[in-house]
Structures are given as C-alpha cells and as structure tokens.
C-alpha cells in the first residue's frame, strides 16, 4: 500500500466518522512566536484546545506538513544516519475538541489499524500512563489487548503538557513489533527499548487536566483528544520495510539522486547516508520555501540555510559539483504534488530560491573545505582531535559553514568541535555590533539613555494628529552627559514629556523642525527612539539658553513631514504593486523613508525587466489617481493577521497593533506617518532598480515634488543631448543610433588600419629575431596606443615567428608595460608567467599570467631597455 493511499484512507476513515478534513497548515506558523516550524498536527488547533477559538466543528482530522530542525525538536544531525529521523515528515492526526474522549479515540485507532490496514494484532503493543487505569481498562476490556502487551510508563514518556501550566494529560502509544532482526539482540529487549524492534506508530494524547502554577491538576470540563501518527512510519510497516527511507514516499526521490550522481543506492553505506540526507533535505527545503521561508543568517531562514548547506556538502561527497538541490524539486513535486498542489503552483519560484542559495554557497565551499582540511591536519599533528572555536567561527563567518555542518564533516575524521568556544566568538561579535557607536563618543550617549530610562523618564509621541505640542523639558544631553542647561551654538539631545516629533523607527527617518522656550530657540535636525516610548530630539541651540524644566513649544516642519508621509504611503503601494507584478513571494527585506526619497528592499531573484518596472510604476500611479482613503485603525494582532494585514516576521509587535489600510490595495502593520488619501502622493517615479545581495533587489523612488524635479531634470538632459546631436525635432534615438553606427564603422576602419600597421611593424620587428640558447627570441620596445594594441601586435608576431619567445615593452600613459608571449610548442620549456615575474621588478612593478601569455606593469618606463636586455640573459640561463 502506497503512502498516498494510506493518507487517503486515514482521512476518509475519520471523515466517515464525523470528522472534518482540515487541510494542513503552512509549515511557517501564523502569529505563534513560540514556534519556529509546525512540528505536530495539533499546532493549527492550539487555540481550540486552549478554549480561545471556536470552530464550526468539534471533530477534525488532517495530514500535517511538519519540520523538526532547530530548537527543542532538532533531528538534523541524525537525519540520514538512522531509519526514522527526518527534518520533514507528515503527521496524520484526529482531534476532538470537547467531543469524544478515550473510549472513542482508542476504538478509532484500533479499528483503523486492524480492520482498515489489516495489521496483525499480535504484533501491536500499547503503553499507558502509570496512573491511567481508565485507558488500560479500555485497551484490555474494550479492544481485547492482552494485559502482557499493555505497558505502563511514567510522566517522561506518557504524560503530555502544552507548557508548565495549562491543558495537559496522559497519553497512550501504539507500537508495532518489526521482528527480532530489527532489534538489539538483548534478551531484555521489549517495548520502550531504544532499538528499532518496537516502533511507536501512533500516539493518543488525552487532554483532561488543567495544571495550575502550583502543580495542581484540575479536571477540564470538556476534555479533548490530540493524536498523531507519522505517515512515513506507518508506510514502512505497511510496505514491510524497517527503514522509512525504503518506503515509496522517499525511494522515488532517492532514485532521482541516483540518476544525478550515477551511483547506486545500497552499494556503499557512506553513499547511502548522503543519498538519504539529500532526499530528506530536498523535501524539507522544497516545502519550507513553498510556505514562505527564505535562506538567511537568523531565525527560520538560518535553519533553512543549514539544511541546504548540509545537503550541498553531501552532494559534493557524491561527486556532484554543480547545483543539484534545485533539480530535486522535480522529484519532490512528482511524489507530493497531488496531495499538496501548492508545490506545482510555486515550483519555478522554489527552484529559483534554491539555485540562488546553491550558487552563493558554491563560491566558498571549496575554499572552506580546504581551510578545514588544513586545520584537521594541523590539529592531528599537534595531538588534538578538537576543532577550536575560533576556527569554527571563521568557517561560519567567512565561508558560510553552519557549525553543525563542520561537525558533520570532521566526525568522519574522529574529530569533535569546541562549541563553547564558538559561542564565545559569536558573543564577541554580537557585543561589537551592539557597541558599533564606540569611538565616536556615542557609547556614552547610549549609556545616558539607559540611565534616563531607568529613572522612569519617558516621552509620549503625540504627532499622529498634530504637528505641535507644549511640553516640559525633562533632560538635556551634551556629548553623552546629562547637563542642566545649554547655550547658543551647542549641539544637544533633548527629551520632553510629550512630543509631535516622530522618532526614527520602522525605516522612517525622524522629523525635523524647531523647539522654542521663553529664553531660547533650537533647530531640530532629527529625532531618534532609543526605546519605544522614549523619543530624543537632536538639536542645535540657535539663540539664548535652554534649561531642564523649561516649558517648550515643539513644532514639526510641515513640508518635510508631508513629504515623508507621501513616501511612506507610496512604499506600501509599491509593495502591493510588486506582489501583483512579480508574485506573492515578494517580501520586504528593508526600507528607508525620508522626505526626499524612499528605498525599498525586497525578495526577488532576478533583475526586473524594463517592462516590469513600467508595470509597477503604472500600477502605483493608478492607485494614486484613484485617490483611495488611507484609514488607520488599532486592533488586536490576531484580528489584524486574520484580516490579511502584512507583517514583518522578525518585527516585534504588541497585542494591539496599528493597521494602515490604503483603500482595497494595501493593508500593513505600521507605526509610521501617512497621507490621508493616496491622491496626496501626487506622482510616483522609480529612479533605480538594483541588486544588493543574492535574492534581494532594491528600488529607489521619489514622489510628489521630488518626482517632478527628477522628471524635469531628465527633460533638461534630453534637451541638452538633442542640442548637441542636432536632433531638436524629437528624433533623438534615431540620431544617436546613426552616430553610434558611424562610430562602429570608424572603429572597424581603425582596427583594419591597425592590423596593416601591425603586419608592417611585425615585418620590421622580425628582422630583429635572435637565437638565445637554441630558442628564437624577439625582444623589442614598441610604440602603441594601449595595452590591447600591444596584445594584438604580439598575436601577429606569434603567427609569423614560427616557434619562439616574444618580449615586448611599451610606455603607455607614462607607465611601463611588458608583454611576454611563448608559442605553444615551447610553453613546456619557457613559461611566460615565470619570465615576466623576473623582468617586472626592473620596471618598478609586478606581473604574472599563463604559460603562453603574461603581462606586467610598472612605474619606470625609462628602464624598459634594461628589462628587454635582461630577457636575453634569463633565457640564456634556462
């Protein structure tokens, strides 16, 4: 029975018994910061079990996509080495939310296994929690399981809880006896042994208690059921194999690895491990990227990168040099696409993400391996078998080797790693990043902010609804030190009880404007936010003296605030347009919003075409012309996400969030300032589109008056070009093309003439060929315009000299240039690179190259004759 058939039968079985089939949730959990990846079927029903969410069903079943790699559930290092560990797996589950309980759950499980799947009852064993007599009685009396096949285990194995407090309860597991051949051989081997003989296939969790902070268990009014059965494990049982990797779910992918590598699975255990690793990781990577994860250096993205790079390492061990993982997507799609159609829909996107990451790692993999091999040899010679932390860090920081990848590589050499030393290096780097202000005096400023905050000093932002406010001065800071007052000419930081100035955050620059007291006037150049509720004004005292405690009149510059608001709302519209034109994979990777421009970094894997840029620009300007209202509301985080608001994964949000909705176009969580309607943006113009990192593009744009100024500048430049080209009639491209065509024609004529001159010159030069040590040598100083002409001349001479060595010297642009060319027949005897390295110091320079052609440059052209003479001597001494 295939894995797909088992999945289908399971869901059908429970649907026929009143369960709603619920599609798998994404692997990336929505609005659950406690969870890196979905790792169990119950994840998407967590709020149902907690009583925080009511659904229109009380019975559910699902086949859930799961990943366990990183954090508490980390199977990565065992993947490929054991029969059952995976990073990606599917969990079949049935759930009851206050509906049925132990009696029905046990009956369902036993019926499905013994009647639908027809498993031999004599090979099935069960376990219950030590004190759960109720479950033991149901198994024995209701289902007829002999007492000798019912095992009791303690809290560690058979009691489940969601946390230190809250819903919890006993669980009951079902085991399948795979036979003595799969066991450890011990006469004491039984259920609970760590060997593979008695394999757990299904776990039934009975949530019947609420655990209080003091550990007291109170019965729940409506107990629930959460069960899980690994599809890979039950498939192994049904297909008569003892390894999940031998099931049809994974064998099809392994066969794809065989085709790519030319190796046969089952012939060599080391190759088999690598094939299993690649097959497993291909599934995990494909589903993770499909569900929205992207490779990065932190969080979920870093776990994904670790999985990909571990697969790349094992591909190299199989002799696969070119990007390989991207080709595995086809195999995963073939095996899983019917059950998960999103794989088919996003196939090309998944391949692009994987290829970009593989190419990035390929650039450093060989160099990193060479360094690691050298280090292993050095440590072995020193009598040590531990790779030091600083080496691990250098491999991570310079070559992109995750620490577990390094551990995996050196394990076969009998080495371990100094993980604690690595963490110390990482912490030093984090400390350096935290103190990047050090040396400028800014570290003192950082300390003073902490001191102010610890004293309870805060600054409330009141600038959403107005650009002015009256507030007392709470603190004045000069050169990182808190002072009582400041006088004209001094640059200071100022904290007030409330302020209309937006403190820089979320990519938006801080406001500028002015602050006045009865005795002073200050110009504010910006505002920052060292803490979410502490805003600091950066100001210069222009007149008078300002003191702590003074009443201040704070006024934000309206033109700059309005320009910033236009650019910020336009950024939201830009992201919406990019997603429409390029695809839903577009996600914000960074942004900058200031009065004069906006900058938006986003995930995309190829440069945008001119047509795509135009479509995005047209869409945004269409949104602007529609003059859609920009509505800002406060709501709880869960409601905002459910309503479809876009949020940044790594951003920290509170329980209540600010939602900015631009008509029906865009809805984002955002704390910035915005226009009241999209029409206020006026005009939107993309200035540049560039790449800033692998898979990250950047758009810079302007709006309103800034965009108009840019367009006018382009018009002025176009008019100036038209005047220079005498194309005032509007035919500038045609005129320019004619000019370029004429230039190309003249270049061809020049090259033709140069060829004739070279031929003539070579004839003259060849008369100077001499024989040195039985080898023809032509050493001459020539006059040429550039290095290309020097190379062209050497090519002509090589064709005419027969067999020989050519050494040319030329003064070009006040610099000495040497070129050595050796005909192919002599390149084994005389190497151009070696010869030029000996001559280059004579002209004050250095050089190198290949055996047949090498060049050098220097600062002393007056020594060219000496260098050419030395060529004769070097050749004679060979």
Swiss-Prot record:
InterPro entries: aa-tRNA-synth_II/BPL/LPL, Ala-tRNA-lgiase_IIc, Ala-tRNA-ligase_IIc_anticod-bd, Ala-tRNA-synth_IIc_core, Ala-tRNA-synth_IIc_N, Ala-tRNA_ligase, Ala_tRNA_ligase_euk/bac, DHHA1_dom. GO terms for cellular component: cytosol. Keywords: Aminoacyl-tRNA synthetase, ATP-binding, Cytoplasm, Ligase, Metal-binding, Nucleotide-binding, Protein biosynthesis, RNA-binding, tRNA-binding, Zinc. Transmembrane segments: none annotated. The gene is alaS. Its EC number is 6.1.1.7. Zn(2+) binds at residues 568, 572, 670, 674. It catalyses: tRNA(Ala) + L-alanine + ATP = L-alanyl-tRNA(Ala) + AMP + diphosphate. It is found in: Cytoplasm. This is Alanine--tRNA ligase. Binds 1 zinc ion per subunit.
């Amino acid at each position: 029975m295939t894995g797909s058939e088992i999945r289908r039968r399971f869901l059908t079985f429970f649907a026929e018994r009143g369960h709603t089939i619920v599609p798998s949730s994404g692997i990336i959990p929505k609005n659950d910061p406690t969870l890196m990846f979905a790792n169990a079927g119950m994840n998407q029903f967590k709020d149902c079990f907690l009583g925080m969410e009511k659904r229109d069903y009380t019975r559910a079943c699902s086949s859930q996509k799961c990943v366990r790699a990183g954090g508490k559930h980390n199977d990565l290092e065992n993947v490929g080495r054991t029969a059952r560990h995976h990073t990606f797996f599917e969990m079949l589950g049935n759930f009851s939310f206050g509906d049925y309980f132990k009696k029905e759950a046990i009956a369902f499980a036993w019926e499905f296994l013994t009647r639908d799947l027809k498993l031999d009852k004599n090979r099935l064993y069960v376990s219950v929690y030590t004190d759960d007599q109720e479950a033991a009685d149901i198994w024995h009396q209701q289902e007829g399981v002999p007492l000798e096949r019912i095992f009791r285990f303690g809290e560690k194995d058979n009691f489940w809880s969601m946390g230190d407090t809250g819903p919890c309860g006993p669980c009951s597991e079902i085991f399948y006896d795979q036979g003595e051949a799969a066991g450890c051989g011990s006469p004491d081997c039984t259920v609970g042994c760590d060997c593979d003989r008695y394999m757990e296939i299904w776990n039934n969790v009975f949530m019947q208690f609420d655990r209080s902070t003091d550990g007291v268990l109170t019965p729940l009014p409506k107990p629930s059921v959460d069960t899980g059965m690994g599809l890979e494990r039950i498939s192994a049982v049904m297909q008569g194999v003892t390894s999940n990797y031998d099931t049809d779910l994974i064998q099809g992918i392994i066969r794809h690895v065989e085709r790519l590598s030319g190796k046969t699975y089952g012939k060599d255990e080391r190759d088999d491990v690598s094939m299993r690793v690649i097959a497993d990781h291909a599934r995990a990577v494909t589903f993770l990227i499909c569900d929205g994860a992207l490779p990065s250096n932190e969080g979920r993205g870093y776990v994904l990168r670790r999985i990909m790079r571990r697969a790349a390492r094992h591909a190299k061990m199989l002799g696969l040099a070119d990007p390989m993982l991207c080709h595995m997507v086809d195999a995963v799609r073939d095996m899983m696409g019917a059950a998960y159609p999103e794989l088919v829909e996003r196939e090309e996107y998944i391949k692009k993400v994987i290829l970009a990451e593989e190419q990035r790692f390929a650039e450093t993999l060989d160099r990193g391996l060479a360094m690691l091999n050298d280090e292993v040899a050095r440590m072995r010679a020193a009598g040590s078998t531990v790779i030091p932390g600083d080496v691990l860090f250098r491999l991570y920081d310079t070559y992109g080797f995750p620490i577990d990848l390094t551990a995996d590589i050196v394990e076969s050499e009998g080495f371990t790693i100094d993980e604690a030393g690595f963490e110390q290096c990482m912490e030093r780097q984090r400390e350096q990043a935290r103190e990047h202000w050090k040396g400028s005096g800014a570290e003192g400023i950082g300390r003073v902010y902490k001191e102010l905050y610890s004293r309870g000093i805060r600054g409330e932002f009141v600038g959403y609804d107005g650009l002015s406010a009256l507030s007392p001065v709470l603190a004045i800071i000069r050169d990182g030190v808190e002072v009582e007052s400041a006088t004209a000419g001094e640059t200071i930081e100022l904290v007030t009880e409330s302020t209309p100035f937006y403190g820089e955050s979320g990519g938006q620059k801080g406001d500028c404007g002015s602050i006045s007291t009865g005795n002073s006037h200050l110009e504010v150049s910006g505002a920052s936010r060292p803490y979410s509720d502490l805003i600091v004004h950066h100001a210069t005292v222009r007149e008078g003296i300002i003191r702590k405690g003074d009443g201040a009149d704070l006024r934000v510059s309206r033109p700059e605030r309005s320009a910033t608001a236009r650019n910020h709302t336009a950024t939201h519209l830009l992201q919406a347009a990019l997603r429409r034109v390029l695809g839903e994979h577009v996600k914000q990777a960074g942004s900058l919003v200031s009065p004069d421009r906006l900058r938006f970094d986003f995930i995309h894997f190829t440069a945008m075409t001119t047509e795509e840029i135009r479509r995005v620009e047209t869409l945004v300007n269409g949104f602007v012309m529609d003059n859609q209202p920009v509505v800002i509301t406060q709501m709880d985080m869960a409601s905002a996400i459910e309503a479809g608001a876009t949020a940044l994964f790594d951003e920290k949000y509170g329980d209540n969030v600010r939602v900015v909705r631009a008509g029906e176009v865009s809805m984002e969580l955002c704390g910035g300032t915005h226009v009241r309607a999209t029409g206020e943006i006026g005009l939107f113009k993309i200035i540049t589109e560039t790449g800033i990192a692998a898979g990250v593009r950047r758009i810079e744009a302007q709006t309103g008056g800034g965009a108009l100024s840019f367009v006018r500048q382009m018009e002025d430049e176009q008019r100036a070009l038209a005047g220079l080209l005498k194309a005032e009639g509007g035919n500038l491209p045609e005129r320019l093309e004619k000019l370029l065509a004429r230039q190309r024609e003249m270049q061809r004529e020049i090259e033709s003439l140069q060829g004739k001159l070279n031929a003539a010159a070579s004839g003259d030069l060849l008369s100077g060929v001499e024989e040195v040590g039985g080898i023809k040598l032509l050493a001459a100083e020539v006059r040429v315009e550039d290095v290309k002409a020097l190379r062209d001349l050497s090519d002509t001479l090589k064709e005419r000299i027969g067999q020989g060595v050519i050494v040319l010297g030329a003064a070009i642009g006040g610099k000495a240039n040497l070129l050595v060319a050796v005909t192919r027949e002599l390149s084994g005897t005389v190497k151009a690179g070696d010869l030029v390295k000996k001559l280059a110091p004579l002209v004050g320079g250095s050089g190198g190259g290949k055996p047949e052609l090498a060049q050098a440059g220097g600062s002393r052209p007056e020594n060219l004759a000496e260098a050419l003479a030395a060529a004769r001597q070097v050749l004679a001494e060979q």
